[in-house]
């Protein structure tokens, strides 16, 4: 129908219309439509010349530069050099609430005539405005209804612009045929733009990405369903001056219900040069989830070779979906990965599974899966997780450098059910562990809790504010299956005694608070009962099968506040001085007749001075007659609440030796002095914690312990961080811990081993070198092992409408010895590549690259893209 419309309109608008005896006759005239003139007075006389008409993007005589300028004007592109993309699309429109509510159509023009059939022929700046549709053109033939109150259909020609304000659609064409009753229209040759939602990250904000797809088609048709059909066209996300890439197609269908675009028989072009044939391609036009193939991934793992992944996403329902991914490894064969996610009113969870039907190198089938779910109904919460892996090297071979997986030695298997309100905290836990490496000895395998039941009560709300009565109850069945023994010659063996433990702890606490300080005395009475199931095969044996322990804990926490406000040219500040005393008394009790089920020592840090027990868990309660004295100072900006500086320093004075240790059973401790060489010291280290905003964007933190008696620093952790408004990041962290009690294994405890030192340094950065180029890197070195533990380097080129990223990583995949977590394994190389077309998403393992960068302190997900 569109063929010949333009010629017909030229004939119509080249005539003067008049009526002769009910017959309409059209008489040709050279110039019935007035041209625009620009006039001014010169020497008392009018001087006029024809106004310069804007160039048409369809003019074949235009140069490339002129055509880009014309297209930018037609699509309402506003130049703004300060933006990375050089500008933005304007969405100015004539939408009014009154127009929508009236459901009427506004029609305006400069000149018009009617024929005898109710057809209006309008010319000169024709505008047709509806609630969510705007039509502009030079000329129009408009068919009205019987009483001339509404438009049935129209044909426009000339410089035609179609706008849909609600969606941001803008179409520039030469011909338009529209049915106003059902909202359909078709055009001839057309340029257009389509809006889409942008992620809230810096590289996709208004300044860094336009947020629009634009394109061209020989014909553009909007159907009654709202779907859009294009023929012989292309789409891209570049601005009108950016033609870096295009996806062309003989047919491009845009489904406005599913918000998907489908391209058939097309090409992927770079700078107008076809580089890939695309028989079929689909992509979203917004951020909603839908079924379809996702972008392939490319990676390399030294254990498995080169991998190519092809994912397919099933949007099964609004509340559950499925992702299937086939990965072809050059050295291993095919691995099938699947992730099923669901969400209901009360539950949500996911199942992740992987299957290698036949591993070329291993000659067998391999697999893994993880099932996790959480639930909530009013005050009831549930949590379930179960992990499985077929063999100890599975994660190493197929994880492609995922640090969280390749260092796993245990598999979580847990179920939790809790009920909480203002007065009750209760729960049921069933916890067990799977072993990744079968060489993990039985003493280093944690106990299962089959099950554990807790009930904690508090009087808050029933007693005065200064008084709190509480009770803690924890009943646990501990169980451990047999495993390989410690094969070191002469080494003591860990016990696998099973037991039931009941822990009851009533407590009374007072809280006397004033604006200038506080006093908080408390008295607690932990009662422990153990029923041990000794076995004849146990190397470590316990004399009594029934053990009861009762220990009172008396504590006083007191402090004062001294505040001072001051103002300078930078704002108003508050400086606070907070001296604090913390006294604890617990009588000594020999606890070597109690096994270690969930107990270990903690590293000495500043906040640990304000805990009554230096052991974790419930199997050891230290004896104490000690006083902590500390002072804290801080400066806070009252205008924004930020802390400019914070300093804390304190020490503990011991009035009795610390006699309780981790010795257990008849094995005693081979070398108790090695495990805790400071148990007879009169004073603890001087412990400190500092945080400073050195200057704008630069922060320094430090934790330092200094032992006065030994005259050495045995605990030091430093971190220097920089992050500016352009997301440039630089971090340096260093830690040196002379006695790392946190790393002691149960086997080392049984051997009475000395805590191992730890010394590492980490450098990391995300640096935007220019508007286009960026680098990211991390380097972690272990001084004790004298080797790199983790290193990666990435490079990004970020263009206006596309981005490319590459990353190399070298990581210690597994512990050389699962019974010694401080010992690093061999380093393995991993390579990743990602190519992203902004507006369409990424090609490559965006999640893998993102997971690497999340190891950098201060990195925000999406800064290097995360797909769209």
Swiss-Prot record:
Domain of life: Bacteria
Cleaved signal peptide residues: 1-24
GO BP annotations listed: Gram-negative-bacterium-type cell outer membrane assembly; lipopolysaccharide transport
Alphabetized UniProt keyword annotations: Cell outer membrane, Membrane, Signal
Pfam families xrefs: LptD, LptD_N
Major localisation: membrane
Keyword Signal: yes
Subcellular location: Cell outer membrane
GO cellular-component term (any): cell outer membrane
Family as reported in the entry's similarity comment: Belongs to the LptD family.
PANTHER family (UniProt xref): LPS-ASSEMBLY PROTEIN (PTHR30189), LPS-ASSEMBLY PROTEIN LPTD (PTHR30189:SF1)
The protein's role, per its UniProt record: Together with LptE, is involved in the assembly of lipopolysaccharide (LPS) at the surface of the outer membrane.
Quaternary data: Component of the lipopolysaccharide transport and assembly complex. Interacts with LptE and LptA.
Protein name: LPS-assembly protein LptD
Organism of provenance: Francisella tularensis subsp. holarctica (strain LVS)
Protein's gene: lptD
